[in-house]
Amino acid sequence: MTVHNNSKIGLIGQNVLFDEVKLIDDGLMDKFILDIQNHIANPTKKSAELIANVRCWSSWLANGIKIEPIFNGKKKACSFIPWPLSGLLLLSSRITGQQPEFEYAADYVLRSGILPDQELDNYDDLSKNIDYIRSIKPLVAFHDFDGNEQGFRMTHLAMERTSNMLIENALLAAEGVDIKENLEKIELATMQSNQLFNAMWKVSEPLLYNKEVRIFIQGLFGNQGSIYPEQGLFFENCGDIFNENYDSKGCYLSNLHGQTGANSSYHPIADEITGVGNHTHAYICLLYTSPSPRD
């Protein structure tokens, strides 16, 4: 579905992704509803993975058709999600508790790359870090499989891989087990994450970030009234609002936030478990107290 598919032009580059999505069999929605009913009656790991996969890949397709016009000379994105993709995305999002918008963890990075079997022994060598990031293969992409998008996304995936050490030792430290040793391992994990982060602009051109990377993950919030209509996205057959442009009924969703690596909980966890958060106050939630009613 990419703009560039290695040496070929992908579906977005050919401006045919929307047309291909409209060919999806309506029967998939009926089948998915049955799958969900079976999962509710008898939940299994396999049935849960099926629902998560539908959520992930329907989100990829929806995001692809949204941005397709931009890469084909248009100033406006596509704001129409056709049936049954619209139903698959909304229902799977509801079941998994996700927003029906592209998400950093579930879609863009963590579920869409194939990690090599072996990690590096350490991350002190920048050139090895670059090779390691380039060895991570994306399952799907919007712009390219081996260029700026691959570099940006797979840098984040490599960083998240080091979180195994962070989470394991944070839990042990919180339980009071070998606190000094576990805090040192947390420090090591965050250092490795930062070492990989330092390779990002070696594998992804910063001047092309907005054009080839950011545009796919920026969401509706702040973009309605510009590249998207004021009403937001229209999901066909998911409501009773009539859309004259597409001669169909559905519903609008608006102000959905896009996501980037800043949505990862990795470094907030590290800051809180080490006490850094006490000094930065970055993650303190200020509670709102309503004024007292007048006598």
Give the positions of each predicted feature.
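Intrinsically disordered, low-complexity acidic/proline-rich regions
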Residues: 1-39
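Long, charged all-alpha helical bundle/coiled-coil segments in cytosolic proteins
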Residues: 41-133
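Non-transmembrane, amphipathic alpha-helical segments
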Residues: 46, 147-158, 178-181, 185, ...
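Acidic, mature catalytic/reactive cores of soluble proteins
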Residues: 73-77, 181-188
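Short, charged/polar, low-complexity loop and linker segments
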Residues: 134-153, 168-176
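Hydrophobic faces of stable alpha-helices that mediate helix-helix packing
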Residues: 156-170, 190
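Extended amphipathic alpha-helical segments with heptad-repeat/coiled-coil character used for oligomerization
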Residues: 186-284
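Conserved small/polar residues in nucleotide/adenosyl-binding loops
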Residues: 288-295
